[in-house]
Regions:
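Intrinsic-disorder/low-complexity, polar/charged segments enriched in Ser/Thr/Lys/Arg/Asp/Glu/Gln
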Residues: 17-21, 47, 85-87, 100
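Compact, glycine-rich, soluble single-domain proteins
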Residues: 39-44, 48-49, 53
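HotDog/MaoC-like acyl-thioester-processing domains
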Residues: 16, 91-120
Length: 120
């Protein structure tokens, strides 16, 4: 299930050699938030992983699958009411076979998640 342009939209993206920054807008009216959790919407961790995967694929231009989640830390809840526009910062390294991704989800200095993932 693709979440882009439904659950979230990319408002701005900047890229340099290794760093890729995506400013997104969460859709607070999406049906996922009605279930997770009614009256207190929180972005599910699985959706955060999927958003990172979609951004990695958009950046690389390749259809990739998550091979390994080396480290996934959720440090604070991402709520569409309090943080409607989080920033995803991705550092992508390609060794020819795999894409090692270090990602942070944040809003200013507040860090919501840190992820170390490998895609093939």
């Amino acid at each position: 299930m693709t979440l882009k342009d439904n659950f979230y939209t990319i408002c701005n993206a900047t890229h340099d050699a290794d760093s890729h920054v995506f400013e997104v807008k969460l859709n607070a009216n999406h049906e996922i938030y009605a279930a997770h959790f009614p009256g207190n919407a929180i972005t599910p961790g699985a959706c955060t992983l999927q958003m990172v995967a979609e951004m990695v694929q958009e950046t690389t231009g390749k259809c990739l699958q998550l091979a390994c989640a080396k480290n996934v830390k959720y440090l604070a809840p991402i709520t569409p009411q309090n943080t409607p526009c989080p920033t995803f910062v991705l550092n992508i390294k390609n060794d020819g076979q795999e894409y090692a991704v270090k990602a942070e989800v944040k809003n200013g200095e507040q860090v919501f998640a840190k992820l170390s993932l490998v895609y093939e």
